[in-house]
Swiss-Prot record:
Gene Ontology MF terms: ATP binding; pantothenate kinase activity
Lineage top rank: taxon: Bacteria
Protein name: Type II pantothenate kinase
Organism classification: Bacteria, Bacillati, Bacillota, Bacilli, Bacillales
Enzyme Commission code: 2.7.1.33
This protein's pathway: Cofactor biosynthesis; coenzyme A biosynthesis; CoA from (R)-pantothenate: step 1/5
Family in the record: Belongs to the type II pantothenate kinase family.
Major localization listed first in the record, in broad terms: cytoplasm
Gene for this chain: coaW
Keyword Acetylation: no
Length: 273
């Protein structure tokens, strides 16, 4: 274990980044409410001397850290942007101006111009929404259990599409677009499967986040939208919802391989530069 680690203590997940003995970038992930596991992991790696920490739960985690650690604090978006720029270079993307949409517990959206960034806005709709509605509607409360079900679920029995409204009449927009998320639930009597409900929840979140990102991109005439966040990790269905809607509006979606670890990567790089 190297002497320095970067920690992104988010609302739902805490991510840790470090370089292992082979100098390879390595990650650990914990639920943020399981702080004892995070502390135990740090204590069990005796070589750690310096910790750069960011994220909404960083203060709380710092209070639990005992020992002779050098603690460096870094603002959340400064860490995230540094991590994103590192990954972009690693993946050989040459993009200077883009919208950065970070889908965490909620969603934050920034304009990025070279090294400068401005917060465009955000929404409370995000990964926390997926998990909250999943728990309320299906009693499934682990992200790892939700994702496989969204792959086999269908939104056809719950969402109202433009085509449903117009029937056989020519509509002014694509018939496949969603007119109302969960709209059919109020007008039909059916026992929907957990997989259909979860697929529809994820559709709602994906479309809300994408629509907001597209509005900001259109306002500033920006082509590329980079979507990051742990909510996208191994979540092929959500990525498909976001990418298809983004491309439909003639923008270019980009998903980074380790985008969910951007904050932890940025914190690590800040402490080791």
């Amino acid at each position: 274990m190297e002497r320095t680690i970067g920690i992104d203590a988010g609302g739902t997940l805490t991510k840790i980044a470090y370089f292992n003995k082979k100098k390879l970038l390595t990650f650990e992930k914990f639920y943020s409410h399981e702080q004892h596991k995070i502390i135990d992991w740090i204590k069990n790696n005796n070589g750690i001397k310096q910790i750069c920490i960011t994220g909404g739960k960083s203060k709380l985690l710092q209070q639990l850290l005992t020992g002779s650690y050098k603690i460096i604090e870094l603002s959340e978006f400064e860490a995230t942007l540094a991590g994103v720029q590192f990954i972009l270079k690693e993946e050989q993307h040459t993009i200077n101006n883009f919208i950065l949409t970070n889908i965490g517990t909620g969603t934050s959206i920034h304009y990025v111009y070279n090294e400068q960034y401005i917060r465009a806005g955000g929404t409370g709709v995000g990964g926390g929404t997926i998990m909250g509605l999943s728990k309320l509607l299906t009693n499934i409360d682990h992200f790892e259990d939700v994702i496989p079900l969204t792959k086999v679920g269908s939104r056809k029995e719950l969402d109202i599409t433009v085509g449903d409204i117009y029937g056989g009449i020519l509509s002014p927009i694509d018939n496949n677009l969603t007119a109302s998320n969960f709209g059919k639930a109020a007008i039909t009597e059916s026992n929907n499967s957990s997989s259909d409900i979860l697929a529809t929840v994820q559709g709602l979140v994906g479309e809300v986040v994408t629509a907001l990102s597209l509005q900001f991109a259109e306002t500033k005439n920006i082509e590329h939208i980079i979507y990051i966040g742990s909510t996208l990790c191994n979540n092929v269905q959500l990525q498909h919802i976001i990418s298809s809607y983004t491309e439909y509006q003639n923008k270019t979606p980009i998903f980074l391989q380790d985008g969910g670890n951007s904050g932890a990567i940025g914190a690590l790089l800040h402490a080791t530069k």
